[in-house]
Amino acid sequence: MTVLAATSAPQRYASLGDYWNLITSVFPASSTPGVNVSYVNAAAVSQAETTSGRQITSAWVTFSGNHVACENASGGTTLTNHPHEIHEILDPDIQKALAAARPSPAEIGREVVLVVPRTFTVDGVSGITDPIGITGHRLDAQTHVVTASTSQIHNLVRAVPQTIDVRELVTQGLASGESVATPDERGLGCVVIDIGAGTTDISVFIEGAIWHTAVLPFGGQNCTNDIAYVLRTPVVEAEALKVNHAHAIPAEADGEPSIEVSLHNRSRDTVS
């Protein structure tokens, strides 16, 4: 994959969940409730088209928010009813197994948005990642199923510019994990934590497959708000302090010079 452009459109507000991100092949940026998300998305797409010199006609749309839930499921299909016959597994057989491993949402107002294959089992032999061409009597699929609020998903799709075809919906955590973790890292097992402004997305990979996804309804904006509250400084100033001077590891802050900040009454004070 080649990244042709990376663009973003600014937004005024950040909520503690339900972040809506638009990802195309050139990775434009995010939008949130509380602003005109259609306008923000269109602006990001326009910038990406200008930068890449190409027209964007389709997109993978990622979503996040505390309405997202996941579970691991399994299901299968019989390949042949004759005990002395074997069947070569083809793509339609895989689709049948995946459909059997797609549970229905237990709650009204929710829907299955994504079914990710983890592994397959053929006649009791497990751990198969690609069963195409293998012969057997029964095929079972182990899947990672993501459900979400039907209304949230509907609003998300409506926020995508009408000129763009939504190819697939993907969780933000899964997209981040597939992007930043190498196949070897996912194979050994890893946790990918994507800290956004209003949400933190967590993805757990085991033996190369996604096993768990979660969304925590807080992120970097919470840190900015805390700095603004404690120092009684504007949010814009607090964000600049966080980006330019904050350290996640206290030892790295040793020797950091004192800095001046703007206070709520427009005076300035020195902090360290």
Predicted regions span which residues?
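Nucleotide/phosphate-binding catalytic cleft detector across ATP-hydrolyzing
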Residues: 2-191, 210, 234-272
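Glycine-rich phosphate-binding loop of actin/hexokinase-like ATP-binding domains
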Residues: 188-230
